[in-house]
């Protein structure tokens, strides 16, 4: 256990540069402060939302369902979010050769990696469980042993979803390693798994039943989303059900660690193996400096399973939204989303929806860090700094085009919009796209991380990626909130915001082009 904690401590310091931040005058300190403020604000927002949701259940006379509901929602959130980072933390890392040479067991290695992932998911679990528990205690009189079991169960909630997703992710990587186009197969299988998770969530939320028995319908929806949450229902026996949940979670976790550690070296080698097929050979051609750098950036992005899965997720959602809008009637989409006048809603909020999903995809925020220890090649290349910057931004803009064009076409075909709304749909998402791309590259240039063990650390958990994501969401939410609270037309606020973002992007782009080296 002592060596497991030592390995965990080392990985934690690699993930979060605590020692560098503590140094006086370090540039990462400002980014860490922004990240802390943004993370705290997001956590408080989720806590407030969970309190309101639990309060709604209590007002409906279904306060006994609060524990099961919070377990179900938090487990689903952990399951969904872990799918983006499981393999990047557990398997296929560059530090395996170093770890294998140390006098540690495989169980200690995978235990430390799993503990790192558990710590991040525990925060999600507590954000749901603690606010819901407060409302539950205030609404339902419960005995002290049951309350202690409920609070203890919060620490066991992430275990089963993490083990399940880790096993699925490993199977995807192992299955795709037998194919020539490994990354394409991995992405297809991963997106299929995400689609299945989304389908289960939607199906569970539309369970039919006797409308006179609201409690039975809610219980069916909760257990449909996450079956183990049924152990927290009163019908499961109270303390017996919660205790059984803790025992099952511990047993699943122990079994996963035992099975995985027995074959960890072989599984890790297989996860990092390349295709057995030889690569195709292409004739050498001359290209302009920009074209050559752009092709290199584009090839590196699409050759990285982790980068495409995470940085391309927003664009994928936008493409799925476009297909659904073309295939299904807008009224049916409104029924699924709980929106009565879907045509009027989308006509007003279409620029916000497109901009929000584009803001989720920002490969430029990790483009510099992904150069790794080979960054000296770019820094010493006889190429203008503006060309280097343009090539990295072009990949981000091209990725956004894959989602922007289908979304705009589908919205224009299916919805009836005024000329001003059409102009906003065409221009406002472009401003957001340019801003988020320039902001991501600007942050990554100021706070790079060239010494990484796994691409997942750079693509998903680095300061520039997280700060750019938070900034993008703030820029999307701010106009909507201003429109709601100040009773100002949304489109007018969006046009003003787009102008501000365009000016900010121009300033950051000018500063990047004035650099001596990347």
Question: What are the roles of these predicted feature ranges?
Answer:
Residues 1-96, 106-376, 385-518:
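Hydrophobic alpha-helical transmembrane segments of membrane proteins
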């Amino acid at each position: 256990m002592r060596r497991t904690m030592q390995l965990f401590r080392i990985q934690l310091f690699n993930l979060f540069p605590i020692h560098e931040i503590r140094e006086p005058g370090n540039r990462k300190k400002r980014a860490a402060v922004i990240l802390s403020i943004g993370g705290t604000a997001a956590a408080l927002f989720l806590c407030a939302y969970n309190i309101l949701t639990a309060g709604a259940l209590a007002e409906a006379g279904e306060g006994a369902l609060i524990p099961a509901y919070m377990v179900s929602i938090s487990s689903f959130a952990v399951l969904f979010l872990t799918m983006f980072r499981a393999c990047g933390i557990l398997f296929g890392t560059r530090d395996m050769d170093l770890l294998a040479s140390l006098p540690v067991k495989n169980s200690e290695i995978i235990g430390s990696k799993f503990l790192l992932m558990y710590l991040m998911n525990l925060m999600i679990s507590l954000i749901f469980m603690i606010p819901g528990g407060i409302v539950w205690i205030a609404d339902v009189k419960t005995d002290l042993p049951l309350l202690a079991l409920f609070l203890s169960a919060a620490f066991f909630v992430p275990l089963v979803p993490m083990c399940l997703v880790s096993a699925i992710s490993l199977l995807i990587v192992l299955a795709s390693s037998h194919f020539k186009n490994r990354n394409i197969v991995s992405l297809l299988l991963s997106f299929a798994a995400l689609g299945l998770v989304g389908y289960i969530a939607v199906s569970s939320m539309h369970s039919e039943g006797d409308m006179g028995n609201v409690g039975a319908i809610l219980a069916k929806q909760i257990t449909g989303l996450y079956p183990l949450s049924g152990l927290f229902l009163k019908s499961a026996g109270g303390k017996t059900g919660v205790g059984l949940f803790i025992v099952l979670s511990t047993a699943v976790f122990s079994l996963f660690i035992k099975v995985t550690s027995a074959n960890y070296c072989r599984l890790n080698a297989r996860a990092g193996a390349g295709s057995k097929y030889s690569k195709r050979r292409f004739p050498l051609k001359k290209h302009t400096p920009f074209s050559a750098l752009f092709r290199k950036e584009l090839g590196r992005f699409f050759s990285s399973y982790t980068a495409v899965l995470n940085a391309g997720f927003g664009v994928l959602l936008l493409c799925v939204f476009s297909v659904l809008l073309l295939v299904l009637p807008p009224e049916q989409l409104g029924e699924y989303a709980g929106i009565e006048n879907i045509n009027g809603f989308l006509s007003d909020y279409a620029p916000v929806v497109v901009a929000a999903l584009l803001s989720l995809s920002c490969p430029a925020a990790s483009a510099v860090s992904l150069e790794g220890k080979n960054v000296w090649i770019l820094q010493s290349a006889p190429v203008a700094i503006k060309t280097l910057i343009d090539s990295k931004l072009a990949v981000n803009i091209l990725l956004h085009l894959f989602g922007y064009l289908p979304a705009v076409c589908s919205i224009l075909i299916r919805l009836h919009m005024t000329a001003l709304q059409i102009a906003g749909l065409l221009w406002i998402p472009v401003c957001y796209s340019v801003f988020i791309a320039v902001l991501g590259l600007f942050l990554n240039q100021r706070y790079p991380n060239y010494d990484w063990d796994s691409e997942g650390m750079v693509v998903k958990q680095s300061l520039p990626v997280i700060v750019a994501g938070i900034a993008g969401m703030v820029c999307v939410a701010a106009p909507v909130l201003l429109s709601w609270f100040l009773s100002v037309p949304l489109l007018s606020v969006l046009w003003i915001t787009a102008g501000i973002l365009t000016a900010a992007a121009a300033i950051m782009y000018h500063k990047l082009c004035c650099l001596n080296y990347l």
